[in-house]
Each structure stands twice: as C-alpha cells, then as structure tokens.
C-alpha cells in the first residue's frame, strides 16, 4: 500500500475530495481496460492510478463544470 504525503499531492490539487475522485475515476478506467501511463504498472489499479496522479501523467478534467 502506498502512503503519499498530502504536501506532495496538494501541489496537484488542494482539495482532498477532488484528489480522491480523480484517483478513483482513473482506477475505474484501469479496471475497465484502459492502458496505464506508467512504464511499469502496479498490481492494484488504485495504486497505479495514484502513482499516475502523483507523477502528473493524468489530471482533472474540468470541462464538465
């Protein structure tokens, strides 16, 4: 299990809720068959999604707001 610091994640988005939603949506995409943007995917989709967000490989889609 990965335990990232909120300080590092707050550089991406200050809202914990928004980060949680972003990671969970990306994890769902990975479960549904989307390709990972990492060179080596982790076993768990949530861990992979979180690492993608931390490495800024995926970002929040604000077009629906």
From Swiss-Prot:
Enzyme class: transferase
An example Gene Ontology CC term for this record: DNA-directed RNA polymerase complex
Keywords in alphabetical order: DNA-directed RNA polymerase, Nucleotidyltransferase, Transcription, Transferase
Catalytic reaction equation(s): RNA(n) + a ribonucleoside 5'-triphosphate = RNA(n+1) + diphosphate
GO molecular function: DNA binding; DNA-directed RNA polymerase activity
GO biological process: DNA-templated transcription
Pfam families in the record: RNA_pol_Rpb6
Highest taxon listed in the record's lineage: Bacteria
InterPro entries: DNA-dir_RNA_pol_omega, Pol_omega/Rpo6/RPB6, RPB6/omega-like_sf
Gene3D superfamilies: 3.90.940.10
SMART domains cross-referenced by the UniProt entry: RNA_pol_Rpb6
Family: Belongs to the RNA polymerase subunit omega family.
Role, per record: Promotes RNA polymerase assembly. Latches the N- and C-terminal regions of the beta' subunit thereby facilitating its interaction with the beta and alpha subunits.
Record's protein name: DNA-directed RNA polymerase subunit omega
Encoding gene, per UniProt annotation: rpoZ
């Amino acid at each position: 299990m990965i335990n990232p610091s909120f300080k590092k994640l707050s550089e991406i988005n200050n809202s914990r809720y928004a980060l949680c939603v972003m990671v969970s949506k990306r994890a769902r995409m990975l479960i549904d068959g989307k390709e990972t943007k990492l060179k080596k995917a982790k076993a768990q989709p949530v861990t992979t999604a979180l690492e993608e967000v931390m490495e800024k490989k995926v970002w929040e889609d604000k077009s629906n707001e």
